[in-house]
């Protein structure tokens, strides 16, 4: 996976395919701020709801088709919020 820095201000991390940050090669977002930043997977989900979880404090996972398997995940380095506080554009 890639290491991403958004810098100061609001950032949107856009993904168009699940393999771009799948559990085998997930990206690390090194400065994710839940009050400003968001993850956009609308090209994958087309508005459908997703299931989310946060494990080990910083590993954020999404089930993009609600089949019980997490297809995408990110390491949100230094993240201190909850899974529900991560803004995901679907």
Task: Put a short name on every predicted segment.
Residues 1-48:
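Acidic, glycine-rich calcium-binding repeat modules characteristic of RTX/beta-roll
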């Amino acid at each position: 996976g890639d290491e991403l820095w958004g810098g100061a201000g609001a950032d949107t991390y856009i993904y168009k395919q699940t393999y771009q940050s799948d559990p085998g090669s997930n990206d690390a977002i090194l400065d994710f701020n839940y009050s400003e930043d968001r993850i956009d997977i609308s090209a994958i989900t087309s508005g459908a709801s997703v299931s989310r979880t946060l494990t080990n404090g910083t590993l954020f996972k999404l089930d993009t088709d609600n089949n019980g398997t997490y297809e995408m995940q990110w390491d949100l380095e230094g993240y201190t919020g909850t899974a529900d506080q991560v803004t995901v554009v679907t």
